[in-house]
């Protein structure tokens, strides 16, 4: 597929290239994001990294609320596991960065206000646990399975029928020198 236009936005006034987008020749806009991780302390007053993460999300919400583009895809490491079954223990992670109420509420607002569909949850029901990230600190990641779903693929509703298959490639976590994230792959017929 040829690319007709590419761009990025300075989110929060910082030129840290956390976003890139392309418009494909078939008029589909593809956005790729890396949302700030947010540091270790889930408090916007005492942790500037967490404050930046929340500000970044709010800016994304404003942007996509105004964006009336049809045929769009959003992918990336959003560093938030929004639903109870996107983490190994909802109760134990409520005060851990990536699953706090302020993060999950803002991500769900972004999803709703931007008219996105969380396509992974169309293929894997909310009742099922699904993870795309496991800590490097846990050597026996499979046995403990203390993961989180931080990597996302969202579609505009007009592309839903194009989505054919979704794969979370957990096997990649066993590769030599793996990432702590595994690929999430959407097969889509554009």
What are these regions (language model features)?
Residues 167-190:
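Surface polyanion/phosphate-binding segment centered on an Asp-His-Pro turn
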Residues 55-155:
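Metal-dependent phosphoesterases centered on the DNase I-like endonuclease/exonuclease/phosphatase
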Residues 8-12, 35-58, 91-96:
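Surface-exposed cleft-lining segments at the edges of enzyme active sites
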Residues 10-13, 141-145, 174:
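Short Gly/Pro-enriched turn/cap motifs at secondary-structure boundaries
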Residues 1-5, 24, 141-162:
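Conserved beta strand-loop-helix elements of the APE1-like EEP
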Residues 21-23, 34, 153-155, 185-189:
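Short, well-ordered beta-strand micro-motif
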Residues 16-21, 149-151, 180-185:
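Short hydrophobic/aromatic beta-strand or adjacent loop that forms the aromatic wall/cage
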Residues 1-40:
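Structured beta-strand-rich core segments of catalytic domains in phosphoester-bond hydrolases
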């Amino acid at each position: 597929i040829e690319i007709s236009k590419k761009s990025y936005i300075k989110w929060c006034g910082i030129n840290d290239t956390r976003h890139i987008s392309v418009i494909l020749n078939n008029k589909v806009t593809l956005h790729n994001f890396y949302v700030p991780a947010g540091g270790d302390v889930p408090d916007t007053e005492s942790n500037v990294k967490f404050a930046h993460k929340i500000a970044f999300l709010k800016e994304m919400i404003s942007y996509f609320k105004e964006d009336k583009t049809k045929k769009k895809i959003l992918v990336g490491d959003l560093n938030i596991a929004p639903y109870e079954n996107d983490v190994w223990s909802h109760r134990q992670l409520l005060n851990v960065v990536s699953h706090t109420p302020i993060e999950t509420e803002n991500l769900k607002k972004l999803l709703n206000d931007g008219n996105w569909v969380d396509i992974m949850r169309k293929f894997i029901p909310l009742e099922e646990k699904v993870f795309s990230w496991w800590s490097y600190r846990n050597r026996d990641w499979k046995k403990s399975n203390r993961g989180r779903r931080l990597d996302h693929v969202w579609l505009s509703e007009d592309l839903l029928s194009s989505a054919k298959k979704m794969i979370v490639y957990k096997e990649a976590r066993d590769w030599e020198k793996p990432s702590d994230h595994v690929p999430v792959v959407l097969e889509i017929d554009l």
